[in-house]
Amino acid sequence: MRSFNRPADARRFLQLFVIAALVLVIRAPFLFQGERFFDSDEAVEGLMARHVLDGEFPVFLWGQRYKGVPEVYLAAAVFAGAGSSVIALKSVTLACFALFVCLQFVLVARLFSQAIAWMATAFLIVGPPSLVFWSLSANAEVVLTMLAGTAMCLGVDVWRRTGSQAAFLMASAAAGFGLWVHQYIVYYWIALALAIVHWLPRRGAILRHIVSAREVPRWLRLTTAVVAGAAAAYVGLGFAAFVTGGFDVTVAGVAVGVRHAQKLWNIAAGLLLLAAGARIYLIVTRHSPSSASLAYAAASAFVAGYAPALAAHAVGGGAPPIGRADLAGVGAAVSPILRDIVPIVAGFKSPSTGWLGVPLWLAAPPVVAVCASLLALRERPFTPVFHYLIVTTPVVFLVSGAFVDAQSYRYLMPMAGSLAVVLALGAWAIFQRSRVAGAGAFVLMLALFGLQQRAWYGQLSPDVQSRAIITCLDQAGVRFASADYWLAYKLTFLTGERIIVAPDNGVDRYPPYGDRVRAHPDAPRIPDKMTEFSCVPDTSSSR
């Protein structure tokens, strides 16, 4: 049981209060200009929150069978007290981000030191524009994934040090909750699994013990060996499909297509987890019978965290989509990734892909800090979970088929918190050799991120188009219209659903809007460009 230390607890509370206050104060200028980087995807979340107050209780984002939306319930509570607005909507994500920053501070302080925790926190607060954007986006999956992943890692660390079953159950519930929110949590699962293996004393002997499984009943040893063999076969087939782009084979006169590497690897991962999990469970419970109850409780906690998704799938079916990529596709993606995605994540391009004009030579301190942090792994046996995360995330991103265009950078954003820690560790490693160089690296990185934020803020222009269109629609007495996806839901939210604008392309996320628009044959179609729009509605292109 945890012993209470009132001075230490009071000091920690004050630290977290200061951190949360800094997050809110430094993000405030961007929050108050939130309409300048508010899009239709975010508007969907706001509309969902409004509908929660009307008795609708969604589990997933409208139009999807994945991407959980716990944030819309928080937004609904805010709307109930403060009314619906862009600022109110984005403030929910900001509050979740502040909680994440506080939680990661606690984790980093436990794993490393207070100094490193403060530096990592500074890099999160004064971070690149891509991080600022997602820390204020109503699509809160990035922030909630980082929050769930950090809670999972913190719970495992507390359990590892103290044996607290409550901490282990918290980690399990966070893992399930994160999976409901988004598949991004897999990044954290992989990194944590590698870190646990890294933590293990005599890990080579332990892994050999699991592979040999001499303590497992013979029938189960053979069964799990067959399952593991099947997993290996699927891995091989997936690799072949990935390298060749896919092919057909004939087995016993039946044509079999081997084309989707990612689907084959998913099957392999499931089989391998099943086989390894069975062996580990039996070996551990044989030596510690009480571990069985903890395993059952942890599984129950995971299910509880993932329960909304399980219930929705049980009622309506569906499954998350699986990306597809092969070696040729990955090779073709390298150039746009280096040209667009890397500069966006690093902060030299804005989230909308425009260059910010910040000198590229300022990238040198972060690069040196990352290298110093990686080299420090060989000199000091600290926990490499954050290093694993920034290495495995891009690899998974590449081979999973997640890349589509420059905006696919969002799939890399869950590693932003870990990157801040790696940069802090690098600055500290440099500081250990030269205080001047270490302090200089830290200051230069903060200056870089500050310049990037300032440049992006200067590029944010008022949303003149949306307000002008709304004024025109009001003057013309229009209450139903159609428009491009990226305009439709945004206008509907900004008008508080006084005007219903349904998309005539892209994803129809909420069919009742489209039904209401189609019920009015005179509903105009709003052109994509403001220069084409007249306050007198043109019904010639009505739906």
Model-predicted segments: where are they?
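Transmembrane-helix motifs of polytopic, lipid-linked glycan transferases
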Residues: 91-112, 131, 148-155, 372-373
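Membrane-proximal lumenal/periplasmic loop motifs of glycosylation machinery
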Residues: 30-40, 53-88
